[in-house]
Every structure is written in structure tokens, then in C-alpha cells.
A protein has these predicted regions:
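Conserved alpha/beta-hydrolase catalytic His-Asp/Glu region
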Residues: 91-152
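Alpha/beta-hydrolase active-site loop signature
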Residues: 7-12, 74, 204-207
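Active-site loop/oxyanion-hole signature of alpha/beta-hydrolase fold enzymes
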Residues: 8-45, 217
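Gly/Ala-rich beta-loop-alpha elbow adjacent to hydrolase catalytic centers
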Residues: 45, 49, 53
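Flexible "cap/lid" loop of the alpha/beta hydrolase fold
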Residues: 54-58, 65-99
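Conserved small/polar residues in nucleotide/adenosyl-binding loops
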Residues: 1-5
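Conserved serine/cysteine hydrolase catalytic core
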Residues: 128-190, 196
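Catalytic histidine-centered segment of alpha/beta-hydrolase-like enzymes
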Residues: 203-212, 216
Length: 235
């Protein structure tokens, strides 16, 4: 098994863009698969990354072997959408490493986050400059999180999820506040009940932070199964 772990544009060690969208990030995923000449590629995307994965799968069609969506909700049209109130600010400069790491937070917050994983992610999310320490991400990517764009993305991705040509599986944190059971049921029906919805016990939205071993076990099981089974045929 060959793993490629990449940062979407504007995040981590990737360069910043003038504008951001799930479509742009999805195209980045396709480009990596092509450049690396990956055989039978499987994309795993968490939260926003799941949306980007759906877009990548929609343009890659059968060139993508599989897509595993991790705690990404596509809501029924009748559900009330979440309210967004993000304020775009320039990344603050912190005096030292200890101070900036103490400011690292999950959104949404959750209990039982494993400290060693939080510490690892925090260290990978910061950079040193002449004045001190700051976050790596481009704060402007947060502009896509507003009520209008959220509803627009939901409508687009309902159609895209229905039309995917690759194998799809969905992992959901059993205690996730982002991905309620109603959305899981709705997504299952969108895919004609041919793709599994797997609830990870005791997991919240950031599954890799509170239930990492359960997440790894679920991913390995899916990938091994896909390598030895045939996909359900669409009616």
C-alpha cells in the first residue's frame, strides 16, 4: 500500500491561492493522482476534505478506484443549515512555540481528544518567521464558509454524490455534531443504499483525534475488502 498525504492549497505546506473552492481543491487531488501515476487510487477525505474528494471522484470517474468520506455531511434539503460566523483575520504572530501551541483548537470542540495527536497536529500547523511563530494556513480560505455558499455546495454535491462511478464508503463519528444520523440515512439513500455507512463507536467529528485506531482499522478493512470483492452494480 502506497500512501500520499497532501496539503490542500492554502493549508499546511502548500502555497496560498488568490481564491479557494472545493472544486479547486478537488482538481488538486486529481492532479496528484495523475502526477504520481497511482494505480487503483483511493481518496480518503475528512470533513471539508470529503467534499473535495467527492468533486475529485466526479471528474475522475472510473479512474478513481474508491472514495472514503470521513464525517462529511450532505444534508437533506429539509434540514436547517448551520450558521456560520467566521471572522477573517490575519494570522497572529506569537512570541514562542509554547504560546502558539497552547492556542491550537479543534472546530467544533470535542472531549477526549488525545493529547499526543493534538500536539503532533499543532506542530505541523505552525511556522517560524522573523517575528516569531504563526499558523501556516491562509486565513482567506475561510471565506468559503458562509451561509449562501454552504447551501450552494450542498445542492451541487447532492447531485455529484448520486452520480459517482467509483466505489464509495462513508465513515461517521458516532457522536459527531457535524454529521447527524439523518444526514447519514439521506446519503445512504442518495447512493441507492449500495455504499456502506460505518459508525465509529465513541468518535466525535475529528475521528483521528479521539479514536485513531478504530479509524485505521475501518480504513484497512474497507481497502482490503475492495481489493477482494466486486462492487454492487447500479440498477
Amino acid at each position: 500500500m502506497c500512501i500520499r498525504d497532501r496539503n490542500l492549497g492554502g493549508m499546511g505546506d502548500s502555497e496560498w491561492r488568490k481564491e479557494y473552492s472545493t472544486e479547486t481543491w478537488g482538481t488538486e487531488i486529481e492532479s496528484v493522482c495523475k502526477k504520481e501515476k497511482l494505480k487503483k487510487p483511493i481518496v480518503v477525505g475528512h470533513s471539508l476534505g470529503g467534499m473535495c474528494g467527492v468533486y475529485a471522484a466526479s471528474i475522475m470517474k472510473k479512474n478513481l478506484y474508491g472514495l472514503i468520506i470521513v464525517d462529511t455531511a450532505i444534508m437533506p434539503p429539509s434540514d436547517n443549515p448551520p450558521k456560520f460566523d467566521f471572522k477573517i483575520r490575519a494570522n497572529k504572530i506569537y512570541k514562542n512555540l509554547k504560546e502558539i501551541k497552547s492556542r491550537f483548537r479543534l472546530v467544533p470542540g470535542q472531549v477526549n481528544a488525545l493529547e499526543y495527536i493534538m500536539d503532533y497536529i499543532a506542530e505541523k500547523s505552525i511556522k517560524k518567521n522573523k517575528s516569531g511563530w504563526s499558523w501556516k494556513f491562509d486565513p482567506n480560505y475561510m471565506k468559503i464558509f458562509n451561509n449562501d455558499s454552504f447551501m450552494e455546495r450542498q445542492a451541487i454535491y447532492r447531485d455529484k454524490l448520486k452520480g459517482l462511478k467509483c466505489r464509495v464508503a462513508i465513515l461517521r463519528g458516532e457522536k459527531s455534531v457535524i454529521f447527524p444520523g439523518s444526514s447519514a440515512k439521506y446519503m445512504h439513500e442518495l447512493m441507492d443504499k449500495k455504499s456502506p455507512i460505518i459508525n465509529v463507536p465513541e468518535a466525535h467529528h475529528h475521528i483521528m483525534v479521539d479514536q485513531p485506531m478504530a479509524l485505521i482499522s475501518a480504513l484497512r478493512s474497507l481497502i482490503i475488502d475492495w481489493d477482494h470483492s466486486k462492487p454492487a452494480k447500479s440498477s
